[in-house]
Amino acid sequence: MIWLGLSIAIFLGALYFSPPQIFTKPPLSLLALAAIIFLAIAWNVSPTLPGQAPGKFYGLIFHFYGASLLTAMFGPAIALAILFPVAFLGVYVIQGGYAEASQHYLMVCVLPTFFSYLTIKAIHRFIPKHLFVLILGNGYVAAFVSVILTGTLLLILKLLFGDASNHIDFEGWLLGLI
């Protein structure tokens, strides 16, 4: 229940800090709705390479990149507001359970959004303003850094608080992030 409360609090805070035009003006509202539907579908696709065992979270990188891309496009508040229905549509409706959807939102939506926003702010502060820097820095570098930092943090949390009987494939985990 604490997961759900924290998720709802973050979502309501994101809605409060989001400009209302994103959800009321027709071109932007359609883009937000399309992002919600597309990400909810894309997050339920789990691509695997030949020879990979299914269920190893190799498709999890789409979740991280989706959150990072929304942060670069709209900013963190709008990204978190869009990702909340995505997490609950994509996880709760398909797999069921408020706890799973809330944990998914917090770990796979909020963390990459946070790291991506911090990376974008650092790029804006320390690197000169240029179109190439905008595209490469905000798009690729922020996404890459947020994926690596989020994946590493989740791996550390899994090692600290996870079940000790489960074997963790470190190479598979880190290669799955890249």
Regions inferred by a protein language model and the residue ranges of each:
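Small-residue-rich segments of transmembrane alpha-helices in multi-pass membrane proteins
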Residues: A32-I41, S68-M73, C109-F114, N138-G151
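Membrane-embedded alpha-helical hairpins and interfacial helices in multi-pass inner-membrane proteins
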Residues: I123-I178
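Hydrophobic cores of alpha-helical transmembrane segments in multi-pass inner/ER membrane proteins
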Residues: G5-L12, S68-A77, V110-I120, I178
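Alpha-helical membrane-inserting segments
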Residues: I41-S46, L70, P85, L89, ...
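Alpha-helical transmembrane segments of polytopic membrane proteins
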Residues: M1-L6, H104-C109, A143, G172-I178
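Interfacial aromatic-anchored transmembrane helix boundaries in multi-pass membrane proteins
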Residues: P47-G55, A87-S116
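Hydrophobic transmembrane alpha-helices
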Residues: M1-L70
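Cytoplasmic-side transmembrane-helix entry/capping segments in multi-pass membrane proteins
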Residues: T24-A35, G59, G66, A79-P85, ...
